[in-house]
């Protein structure tokens, strides 16, 4: 039995070392038809800027469900958004009141616009809120639901 364990250990160490990959890519084209860049135009208020940064991260995560590819400044489409209002509310109050208290509600209001080569092709105002329940809802839920709605607009689901 000890010999079998030694053989398996040797195989376990040597077999992964015998694998590898090599790739050569020659390309003279670029896919710029469905590239998009995200531009945060939120004001200089630090609380709103932090919310804008979190929303941008959530939008980047949601882009994988659309036909767009995230690119830099030379992208064909530019998604510009601005956080107009952000109130995280009180999660503890939402848990305690089971979402009944209006003052504990977390709210996020965003204006977004899609530009194609400098021309606006669509604009939306997205309102997201978390009112509570047993878990109270998290601040990230605000950003995730707003980003999902923006991605739905980009896909043309509305």
Spell out what each predicted region is.
Residues 48-56, 105-108, 136-147:
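Solvent-exposed, acidic/flexible segments
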């Amino acid at each position: 039995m000890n010999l079998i364990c030694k053989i398996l250990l040797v195989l376990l160490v040597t077999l992964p070392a015998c694998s590898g990959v090599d790739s050569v890519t020659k390309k003279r084209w670029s896919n710029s038809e469905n590239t998009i860049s995200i531009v945060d135009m939120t004001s200089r208020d630090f609380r709103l800027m932090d919310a804008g940064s979190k929303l941008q991260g959530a939008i980047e995560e949601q882009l994988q469900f659309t036909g767009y590819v995230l690119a830099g400044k030379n992208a064909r489409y530019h998604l510009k958004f601005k956080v107009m209002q952000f109130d995280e509310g009180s999660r503890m109050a939402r848990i305690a009141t089971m979402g009944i208290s209006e003052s504990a509600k977390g709210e996020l209001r965003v204006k977004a616009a899609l530009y194609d080569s400098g021309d606006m092709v669509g604009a939306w105002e997205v309102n997201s809120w978390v009112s509570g329940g047993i878990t109270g809802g998290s601040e990230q839920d605000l950003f995730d639901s707003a980003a999902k709605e923006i991605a739905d607009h980009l896909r043309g689901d509305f």
